[in-house]
Amino acid sequence: MMKKLLALLIFTTSLANAQYTVKGTMTPPDKGDWVILYKIEGAKQKFLANATIKFDTVAISGEKQVLGKFSFELPNTATPGAYRATYRNSGAGFVDFFFNKENVEFVFNPKYPDQSVLFTSSRENKLYNEYLQAYNAVQKKIDSLQASYIETKSKDTKKAYKKELKELEDVQEMYENKSEGMLVNSFIKASRRYNSSNPHDNVQDYLSATSENFFEYVDFKSDKLYNSSFLIDRINDYVFYLNYSEDKDVQQKLIKESITNVMKKISSDKLEKAVINYLISALTEKRNGPAVDWMFAEYYDKLPAEDQDVDFKKEKLDILLATVGRVAPDFSWKENDQEYKLSTLNDGNKYLLVFWSTGCPHCIKEIPELYKFMQTHKEVSVVSFGIENEENEWDEFVKNLPGWHNAIGTHPEYKFDNETVKKYNLLGTPSYFVLDKDKNIIAMPDHVEDVEKYFNSDKE
């Protein structure tokens, strides 16, 4: 009797102290040597742990190959849900996976993790990836047949479309049944795409139906979907990629319509806040000032006071101080002992504001090219702003730029901390801004070639 009791105590103690492992193998390894593990909660990432990548060389088919390996331990109290292993600060530098009280192991290429990840341990992740591959293979055939039918209106194509549609429904039903009671069941149900029972006759009908039914199988009330990247990823695709127009005004309208449609589907306060914050951040990254203003006025400012963050709003608006649709931030400078201000200049129908530096090799090459080109556009007043540590080299350089307004900005510690430079939130030099006569920013060309293209087309 005592032996049985002791065995039971040992068993229950081992259960209480049980740990799960998350192991990843990079092939080939990334440049960095660190990985951070997060749990996804809403639209945010909750830090859990970090690990160092250990490098190993193995022989595969007689050739040496370097692998990068990392591992994490999760306690028995770790909650099921969506997790993320991040190995890079920017870009697609992470692998998302599900944890549901089981060990997780995967192999991937860090350059394209989504396409390459292979789970070698974890029933949940293996099944979900198997489902995605099976479903997407059939969906690809359906998409191809839909495109073909628009071109040919063939009865055989329509028949093939219906056959593949039945195959897709069978795949969906099979994996929903296989995943019954599992964490990934909610994601398998929500990953289903809308397909009409018959192929559409034209592109517009197809796009309209796809847009109207994009969220047909998405449960916005699901906590499992909320605590993952799934909802945000779907919303991102719908708002920014499903509808697109080359016309900027039309594109702004499409973005607003898409966001309005999304917000109508959300009834949860916590999801509403998460989506609003995400969309504002995404639009800010895209430097879409008018859309961000609209988001603040239409949604953010109407949130309960406790859900608003003054610092969040200020940060986003500061980033957008100098973007298309905004009045260019004002600054002053001296020319021949005379004071000038950008806001009061009145010597051009339009203005080209260019930020550059004598310490920038691209600038040294592009500014003379720009100067030569702008001689053919005398109706445009050019304001060049040198970002410098000191004035001597700049003084000599601008002697070759007569007829331009040449301003300079310095800073005792770091030239890019100059007040004017910070207002324009420059991502690099040279940076170009086209202003109308009222100093509204109307274009932000990326390179000198884009400046030339803009003014040449403007002259036509």
Enumerate the predicted regions with their spans.
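A non-transmembrane, solvent-exposed segment enriched in polar/low-complexity residues
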Residues: 19-180, 187-191, 195-217, 221
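Thiol/disulfide oxidoreductase modules built on the thioredoxin-like
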Residues: 191, 413-456
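Charged, long alpha-helical assembly modules
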Residues: 191-268
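N-terminal "domain-start" segment that seeds a small globular fold
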Residues: 306-343, 409, 453-460
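Short active-site neighborhood of thiol/selenol oxidoreductases, capturing the structured segment around
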Residues: 341-370, 381-383
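Structural microenvironment flanking redox-active thiols in thiol-disulfide oxidoreductases
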Residues: 364-401, 414-420
